[in-house]
Curated annotation (Swiss-Prot):
The keyword ATP-binding applies. GO terms for cellular component: cytosol. The gene is glyS. Belongs to the class-II aminoacyl-tRNA synthetase family. InterPro entries: DALR_anticod-bd (IPR008909), Gly-tRNA-synth_bsu (IPR015944), Gly-tRNA-synth_heterodimer (IPR006194). This is Glycine--tRNA ligase beta subunit.
């Protein structure tokens, strides 16, 4: 069967930049699905996207479906012919329905019954006949939240469609897609090459468009932007900040990228750089430049869609546009400094945190009380912790945060520095919200750690205290994410404290606001402990490792983490699988037999294998116990791994359930001693493989 290269392009008005890549990928997936369902083989489907077009190149696709044979089942052979071998009325009716003669009949075996059938040859449909509907279905299935219809069209799409190209090699496939007749004419850059571009062959698409100032390949266009941005940054000894989502959006805004470096007045560098970066990235789609120390430089890079003969005009135009935005940020910053942070608490008394839990000032005072209590655990200075807690939410009333909500905490840090607060206090204001997401950095200061922990605990315990715990997909206070943050703050700062102790401290700050302390405590502790799985699964830890540790129900997150790391390491040892299986066998034996308490009686050890295992246990126990006391669980399990050989020998050569009651009881005690050594770390019997 012959193979062809197909090109499909849908030309539109400018597509939504934040959706362009998603639309391209979805079109590719849906088209591949349609081709597969139609039984059309192909080598690959390449997808392209630019602001005014979505396109596909289908390589080496079949010219048509393969011919097939369809079976139509008739009556059983026994009922199809009479005693003389002539067709019965049942068979005649079947033949009439199919429009066939006796000579065209076949038979097949259906279980124990032989039946008559008609095998009809079905010729496969051509690519030309199938492809238009495959593409239209793919377009209909694109993830478009809101479709629009142009005045001249009955069909809907994310933006009005202007043209359609559908080529099979050098031939146009006759089709109407999105109410537009397909052809071989596309269009170049809106300004550089607005005239029609006739495609002689499907393979000419990318090259023909590049001659018309359109880079249709998204990845190539993006790589060009990255190269140009880096070159411009290198020229001023700086590094560009290039967030992935911003790069995707800028790539989706231009057909012919031309990066240009512009400047802004150095006086704006006195404004918190986070505010400047936010406004330039979010509002203007600029790439900001920083030096080796991470300090913002007075430059930005804009990506134009035009290769101008006078790029200075474009640069100056962007500088003129950005100046008012930077001036606004500067104004807010200067205005805020007229009112000290501490004096803003009055405004917090009018800002509701949660109807039943009070205002943001109520929350601040609770956090302050809790932070002082936590200081003995985190090692923070209690006075610093209290002051930082009382100032923590004050910047929420500032003009700067009102304009740039993502600067909450960060703005407070700047204002606290200006007011002369010490580093622990000022940095804690920005660090209180860390970590913001999975894998985010943690606070660097002890005071920041204390406030971050206190803030999350206050919210979690308070929300549980009023009976509004997360349910299903509803988690308005982001308590699931907050709980993982609490666990990380404890574990990564090596805080030796139990979850229940922390919850109790938070409950003390609430007093009578929370009516049922016992239920709140139990629910909050269970919720936090339930987040271990999400935390460790994000790190790639296997579920059975968690189950092995959870079987012991450690109270301290730090202790839990050490055990998880130990079991994770244990799984990599060559002895692990055999020891896990042996532990499972031991656990099953001991579960059925109650008489396993007490010490092993050495005189009742009669088999060499049980004597050897006892000797090994006697030797390893004084080595392992200090490691357990020091919570060096990894080393403890590594030492216990040496027991594999004597354990294997024991089960190979010793009958645990001996007829002699004393021997049986002694062997059960020996196994219990072995089991207890392992379960001092985790229940390794639950490990798989």
């Amino acid at each position: 069967m012959s193979k062809h290269t197909v090109l499909f392009e849908l030309g539109c008005e400018e597509l939504p930049p934040k959706s362009l890549k998603t639309l391209r990928d979805a079109l590719q997936v849906e088209t591949v699905k349609g081709l597969n369902e139609a039984g059309l083989n192909f080598a690959s489907v390449e997808a392209y996207a630019a602001p005014r077009r979505l396109a596909l190149k289908i390589v080496d696709v079949d010219a048509a479906q393969a011919d097939t044979q369809k079976r139509f089942d008739g009556p059983a052979v026994q009922a199809a012919y009479d005693a003389e071998g002539k067709p019965t009325k049942a068979l005649e009716g079947f033949m009439r329905g199919q429009g066939i003669t006796v000579e065209q009949l076949s038979t097949f075996q259906a279980g124990k019954v032989e039946k008559v059938c008609y095998l009809k040859d079905v010729k496969g449909q051509s690519l030309d006949a199938l492809l238009p509907q495959i593409l239209q279905t793919a377009l209909d299935n694109l993830p478009i939240a809101k479709r629009m219809r142009s005045a001249a069209s009955r069909t809907e799409f994310v933006r009005p469609v202007k043209w359609v190209v559908l080529l099979k090699d050098d031939q146009v496939i006759e089709a109407t897609i999105q109410d537009h007749k397909a052809g071989n004419v596309t269009y170049g850059h809106r300004f550089h090459a607005p005239e029609a571009v006739t495609l002689a062959h499907a393979n000419d698409y990318l090259a023909a468009l590049e001659k018309a100032y359109v880079v249709a390949n998204f990845e190539k266009r993006q790589a060009t932007i990255q190269e140009q941005v880096k070159k411009l940054a290198d020229e001023v000894n700086a590094t560009a900040i290039v967030p992935a989502d911003l790069l995707d959006e800028v790539t989706s805004l231009v057909e012919w990228p031309v990066a240009l470096r512009a400047t802004f007045e150095e006086r704006y560098l006195a404004v918190p750089q986070e505010a400047l970066i936010t406004t330039m990235q979010d509002n203007q789609k600029y790439f900001c430049l920083i030096n080796a120390e991470g300090k913002l430089q007075p430059y930005f890079i804009t990506v134009s869609n035009i290769e101008s003969k006078d790029p200075t005009q474009i640069i100056e135009g962007n500088e003129k546009v950005v100046r008012p935005r930077l001036s606004d940020a500067e104004f807010f910053f200067l205005q805020d400094q007229k009112q000290p942070l501490a004096s803003r608490k009055e405004k917090l008394t009018n800002m509701v945190f949660q109807a039943q839990l009070g205002t943001l000032w109520d929350k601040s005072t609770r956090i302050a009380k809790l932070a002082v209590a936590l200081s003995s655990i985190t090692g923070a200075n209690p006075a610093d912790a209290e002051k930082a807690a009382l100032l923590a939410k004050c910047d929420l009333t500032s003009e700067l945060v009102g304009e740039f909500p993502e600067l909450q905490g960060i703005a407070g840090t700047y204002y606290a520095r200006i007011e002369g607060e010490n580093t622990e206090v000022s940095e804690a204001l920005g660090e209180q919200y860390l970590p913001k997401f999975a894998g985010d950095v943690l606070p660097k200061t002890k005071t920041g750690t204390t406030i971050a922990l206190a803030d999350r605990l206050d919210t979690l315990v308070g929300i549980f205290g009023i009976g509004q715990a997360p349910t299903g997909s509803k988690d308005p206070f982001a308590l699931r994410r907050s709980a993982i943050g609490i666990l990380r703050l404890i574990i990564e700062n090596e805080l030796d404290v139990t979850i229940e102790e922390l919850v109790n401290l938070a409950l003390q700050s609430y007093g009578d606001i929370v009516k049922d302390h016992d239920k709140t405590r139990a629910d909050a502790v269970a919720f936090l402990e339930g987040r271990y799985r999400a935390k460790y699964e994000d790190q790639g830890v296997a579920v059975d490792v968690l189950q092995a540790v959870q079987a012991l129900a450690p109270k301290s997150p730090l202790d839990f983490d050490k055990r998880v790391n130990a079991v994770n390491h244990f799984r990599t040892l060559p002895e692990a699988a055999a020891l896990a299986a042996a532990n499972k066998r031991v656990a099953n034996i001991l579960a059925k037999e109650a008489a396993s308490e007490g010490s092993v009686v050495e005189a009742n050890l009669v088999e060499d294998a049980e004597k050897a295992l006892f000797a090994e246990l006697q030797a390893v126990t004084p080595v392992v116990e200090p490691l357990l006391t020091a919570k060096d669980y990894t080393a403890a399990l590594s030492k216990l791994a040496a027991l594999r050989a004597p354990i294997d020998a024991f089960f190979d050569g010793v009958m645990v359930m001996a007829d002699d009651a004393d021997l049986k009881a002694n062997r059960l005690r020996l196994l219990a001693q072995l089991r207890n050594l392992f379960t001092a770390v985790a229940d390794v019997s639950v490990l798989q493989g």
